[in-house]
Amino acid sequence: MNLKPIGDRLVLKKQEKEEEKTFSGIVLPSSAKEAPVYAEVLAIGSEVEEDEKMKGNIKVGDKVIYSKYAGTEIKLEDTDYILVKYEDILAVVE
């Protein structure tokens, strides 16, 4: 199943982080971690592709940092996705 974002939205796939440990070696459970802010762009809405100000800034496959509380989380076929607006993308990781 494919997600096709509408307007100025993007479909992102959250990037898994490695297991985190404290300085003393205690493994932090995922519930103790902050919400992920790194993701890979899987699809881009038509408005982002056509608007002169947005066009070319973000491409499918880019790794991005997005606003922590932005977007709508969706789970399809055991995969977690997040739909965010273009304005919620803070940076492209190069």
Curated annotation (Swiss-Prot):
SUPFAM superfamilies: GroES-like. GO terms for cellular component: cytoplasm. GO terms for biological process: chaperone cofactor-dependent protein refolding. It is found in: Cytoplasm. Keywords: Chaperone, Cytoplasm, Stress response. GO terms for molecular function: ATP binding; metal ion binding; protein folding chaperone; protein-folding chaperone binding; unfolded protein binding. Belongs to the GroES chaperonin family. Heptamer of 7 subunits arranged in a ring. Interacts with the chaperonin GroEL. NCBIfam families: PRK00364.2-2. Together with the chaperonin GroEL, plays an essential role in assisting protein folding. The GroEL-GroES system forms a nano-cage that allows encapsulation of the non-native substrate proteins and provides a physical environment optimized to promote and accelerate protein folding. GroES binds to the apical surface of the GroEL ring, thereby capping the opening of the GroEL channel. This is Co-chaperonin GroES. It comes from Finegoldia magna (strain ATCC 29328 / DSM 20472 / WAL 2508). The gene is groES.
